[in-house]
Swiss-Prot record:
The gene is gpsA. This is Glycerol-3-phosphate dehydrogenase [NAD(P)+]. It comes from Mesoplasma florum (strain ATCC 33453 / NBRC 100688 / NCTC 11704 / L1). Transmembrane segments: none annotated. Its main location: cytoplasm. It catalyses: sn-glycerol 3-phosphate + NAD(+) = dihydroxyacetone phosphate + NADH + H(+); sn-glycerol 3-phosphate + NADP(+) = dihydroxyacetone phosphate + NADPH + H(+).
Length: 334
């Protein structure tokens, strides 16, 4: 397959990991960042030490703090910024883009304003411009440092057509990074968002030394409620049983590398979610997701007993022990 000109918006850990994969596949990769020190770190020292210390990345990766330069001849554009920054970034992309591009989103979350899918909101941001050729979303169990270390990883790419998804698989996939194609954007997106809230519950159970049986119960109930939620948006069951669903859930809800999991542990340590959040300096996506998912569930009358417990712990001053006391109650499986 011919080389692609690929732009990654953001110089975060995951964007850097994807840049390394794509550069390993002989694509032309440029990253756009706003922190000059990071841009220099990538260009001069071939590393992103903010996230990966002195670990080297592919020497062909370039970085710039000029959006115009980043979009000079882009075929594929990857949105590697947090959900809250997307609207501002899209405005700049529309301003400087030279041609229509395949847009791939990696941000996780739900649409708070419209109580819907993030993908619908992002596509709406691009409306009226000639910038977006196709829209895709990339999700799955892929801790950034392991991808940079070229450890075996498998994720999913969801596109509007299976042909486009397969084409993008060929761009990304190699001997250590496998990408599976699907058209279920809704299923991938919902899985990526909701598993973060479930991971908070995983950390809570771990901190109480609840054992593997309870943890397996949590994963089972969480996965079922993810699917119940997803059905409302037309998501497919098979997606929740694949890398973006079950795979990412197992990883995020079981690993101390997950910020959401660590927050759950911290909540138990302080016995107070508000105090835990105040002491936690990192962005934890599952907190906002739990609130928005709750609002969507109420609006559309989606039964989500497990998510209600997480929501009440985070927002209604319910003590974390309530998860342990209630996780086995009102069990409803697909």
């Amino acid at each position: 397959m011919s080389k692609k000109n690929i732009t990654i918006i953001g110089t975060g850990a995951y964007g850097t990991a994807l840049a390394n994969v794509l550069a390993d596949n002989d694509n032309n990769v440029i990253m756009y960042g706003i922190v000059e020190q990071q841009v220099d770190d990538i260009n001069i020292y071939h590393q992103n030490s903010v996230f990966f210390d002195n670990k080297k990345i592919n020497k062909t990766i370039r970085a710039t703090n000029s959006m115009a330069a980043a979009l000079e001849n882009t075929d594929i554009l990857i949105l590697g910024v947090p959900t809250a920054a997307i609207k501002h970034v899209v405005n700049d992309i529309i301003k400087y883009a030279k041609k229509p591009m395949d847009i791939i989103n990696t941000a996780k979350g739900l649409d708070e304003e419209n109580l819907g899918l993030l993908s619908d909101k992002i596509k709406k941001y691009f409306e009226g411009s000639n910038v977006i050729s196709t829209y895709s979303a990339l999700y799955g169990p892929s801790i950034a440092i392991e991808v940079v270390d070229r450890q075996p990883t498998a994720i999913m790419i969801a596109s509007e057509t299976i042909e486009k998804a397969k084409e993008l698989c060929n761009v990304f996939s190699n001997e250590y990074f496998y990408m599976y194609p699907t058209t279920d954007i809704a299923g991938c997106e919902i899985s990526a968002a909701l598993k973060n809230a479930i991971a908070i519950g995983g950390g809570i159970l771990k901190a109480y030394n609840a054992g593997d049986n309870a943890h397996a119960t949590l994963l089972t109930l969480g996965l079922n409620e993810m699917y119940e939620f997803g059905k409302h948006f037309g998501a497919k069951l098979e997606t929740f049983l694949n890398f973006a669903g079950l795979g990412d859930l197992i990883l995020t809800a079981s690993s101390k590398k997950s910020r959401n999991f660590r927050l759950g542990e911290r909540i138990v340590e302080l016995n107070d979610a508000k105090k835990a959040l105040e002491s936690f300096n990192l962005t934890v996506e599952g907190v906002e997701t739990a609130r928005i998912a709750h609002e969507i569930g109420v609006k559309y009358q989606i039964s989500m007993n497990f998510f209600e417990i997480i929501y009440n712990i985070l927002y209604n001053n319910v003590k974390p022990i309530s998860l342990l006391n209630n996780v086995f109650r009102d069990v409803k499986l697909v």
